[in-house]
Regions:
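Short S/T/G/P-rich N-terminal loop/turn motif that feeds into the first structured element of a domain
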Residues: 1-209
């Protein structure tokens, strides 16, 4: 299993229209493969939409992308290309301890925090080992929706996405996770060389809400 994470930066004020068009084209898109998640940014880099598609492997993705290019039903509908300022696509591999995206129901109206850590080459195995031990206790406070390492695109990235009811719960959980007696953050013996985060809101049609 791999996940393609596509991030589009849009012109200010166009996110609602882009999502509306995406929703209209989605039934045709779903004939080819399933959507994993669709979010837009609330904090962090603004005016971004992030859509995630799971595939069996790279060959599966290639077949789907080729079929999409030839799909007259989908291509007849406006997609919003005129709104796009920049596009980025990355292929992610799920961490061994990650549950499949969308395999749990978090309800609706949630906030998702996507944190991306970039490590020095060779450090990710240590990070994965430490996180595998620490995640079960951390999930007592809030669910881990996704955890990936980058395979294609920007390399040496570790991406983890957490679910919160709102920004206030996020603050409470982060304080609680660092309380005495809790082994968080995981101690891998290595530190990221770069960190960034985004707070995300799911689109109305996103399977992960």
């Amino acid at each position: 299993m791999i996940y393609e994470v596509r991030t589009y930066t849009l012109r200010p004020g166009t996110v609602p229209e882009f999502e509306e068009r995406y929703a209209k084209r989605l039934p045709a898109r779903l004939k080819h493969s399933q959507l994993g998640a669709f979010w837009h940014t609330e904090f962090g880099t603004l005016n971004q939409v992030i859509h995630v598609y799971p595939y069996d492997d790279l060959q599966h993705r290639t077949r789907v992308r080729a079929a999409l290019a030839q799909d007259p039903e989908r291509n007849a509908l406006p997609g919003g290309q005129e709104f796009i300022v920049a596009q980025e696509a990355e292929i992610m591999t799920p961490a061994p301890f990650m549950r499949p995206l969308g395999s749990r129901d978090y309800g609706a109206g949630n906030v998702y925090e996507m944190r991306t850590y970039t490590y020095a080459p060779g450090d990710l195995p240590k990070v994965l080992e430490a996180w595998a031990k620490a995640v079960p206790a951390r999930e007592e406070l809030s669910p881990l929706a996704a955890c990936w390492t980058s395979e294609l695109g920007g390399l040496n990235k570790f991406v983890h996405t957490w679910v919160y009811k709102d920004v206030n719960e996020r603050a409470r959980v982060r304080d609680a996770s660092r309380a005495p007696g809790r082994a968080w953050p995981p101690q891998s013996g290595v530190r990221p060389i770069r960190q960034e985060n985004k707070l995300l809101i799911a689109a109305s049609f996103s399977p992960v809400r």
